[in-house]
């Protein structure tokens, strides 16, 4: 089941992000989220703006992600998006590590909202790149988060 996150979920969300940061470091990607990203404040903002989602099953919270219908960092791309149509962007995707399939569940949810899906990731995040490629996204160039943090940009038109 996928549902909107609430502030009651904050502790569990931040625990998932803590596990994800450790996993990223252990798999050769120490820089994407460092020690403190996503920040508590950015998670609260996403909850308040009703764009943070929880993936849960009988086992409890399996993963978390945000779904944006616009991202200012995507306005300037060193490359070219597949089209300029309205889109959704998957951000802050993380799993608790207990069960596979979190990426696919988030992607299927995004597909239910739009046929235009964008996502970005760090050049060292090989696990995310593999998930992106397995799901037929096209690499379209590079974007810069907050104008400076380089990310690989991908686009899927369903």
Residue ranges and their predicted role:
Residues 22-41:
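Conserved GNAT-fold acetyl-CoA-binding loop/helix
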Residues 42-54:
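A short helix-loop-beta-strand connector motif used in the catalytic cores of GNAT acetyltransferases and
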Residues 112-124:
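Conserved GNAT acetyl-CoA-binding A-motif
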Residues 120, 138-152:
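Conserved catalytic-core motifs of GNAT/GCN5-like acyltransferases
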């Amino acid at each position: 089941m996928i549902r909107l996150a609430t502030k009651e979920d904050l502790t569990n969300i931040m625990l998932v992000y803590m596990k994800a940061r450790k996993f990223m470091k252990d798999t050769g990607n120490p820089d994407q989220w460092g020690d403190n990203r996503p920040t508590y404040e950015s998670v609260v903002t996403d909850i308040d703006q009703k764009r943070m989602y929880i993936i849960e099953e009988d086992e409890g919270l399996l993963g978390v992600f945000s779904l944006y219908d616009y991202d200012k960092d995507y306005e300037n791309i060193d490359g070219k998006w597949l089209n300029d149509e309205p889109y959704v962007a998957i951000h802050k995707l993380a799993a608790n590590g207990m069960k596979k399939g979190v990426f696919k569940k988030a992607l299927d949810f995004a597909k239910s909202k739009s046929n235009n899906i964008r996502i970005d990731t760090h050049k060292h995040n090989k696990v995310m790149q593999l998930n992106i490629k397995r799901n037929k996204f096209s690499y379209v160039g590079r974007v810069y988060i907050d104008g400076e943090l380089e990310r690989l940009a991908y686009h899927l038109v369903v």
